[in-house]
Amino acid sequence: MMKPPSGVFTRREALKALGVSAASLGLATLGVSRASAADKKSGDVPAEPAPPPMPTGPYTLPALGYAYDALEPAIDLVTMQIHHTRHHQAYITNANRTLAAYPEFGKLSPEDLLRNINRVPGSIAIAVRNNVGGHANHMLFWDILTPGGAKEPKGALGSRINSDFSNRDTFFREIGEAAAGRFGSGWAWLAVYNKKLFVISTANQDSPLMDGYTPILGIDVWEHAYYLKYQNRRSEYVGAVMSLLNWDKVGARYTEAITG
């Protein structure tokens, strides 16, 4: 057997020098173990350290204007719960963390920050695009959905759709194709630019606000928005979402965009 290096005690030598036998050490260890078990039974075990607090900041998760199951069967309850409380919340948490060192940007609304994305330092620009964009996009998405939908575009918005897309059927076809045909993750939008309407598509969580457009309707085509129910049938999901659009809300956003 190899001997330990000179000057290093073996366990037996250390116990001998301390005047402690291996047997007594074993009994002592057993006593500690029994005491520890007794502590656990008596509830005297120190509490686990609390997890670090979640980063706080300017953004909080908005409540929905309807129950999680209100959009069924088009969007199922579980998808809504996960989408809202986990995915949307994650964008908010990461946005607040990103802006913690930049309080001047936290004073801006998400929309104004995205409109001024060129002022954002390069070190946080991608995080702002992804997370502040994700927050703003989802706030709009939740707002323009309603159980059973809300009729059809009417008033100034309805007239503008007929003017800019020839007719409503053409508009519905174009936005449906933009949503279903978006490669990878992203969004399809109805957006206002110079008081005219455009159907556009953006990747990931990029917002039309970054390019000077004002979005008034958005369709989320990230897989987390539909995969539990529709799997790879994105076109079916897009059609279902179209039946939930709250055209009263979209019309109000259009009026604000052309008059604000």
Language-model region placement:
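Internal alpha-helical transmembrane segments of multi-pass membrane proteins, especially GPCRs
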Residues: K16-G19
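C-terminal segment of N-terminal export signals and the immediately downstream linker at the start
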Residues: L30-L71
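All-alpha RGS (Regulator of G-protein Signaling) helical domain and cognate RGS-like helical scaffolds
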Residues: P58, A74, R86, R97-K107, ...
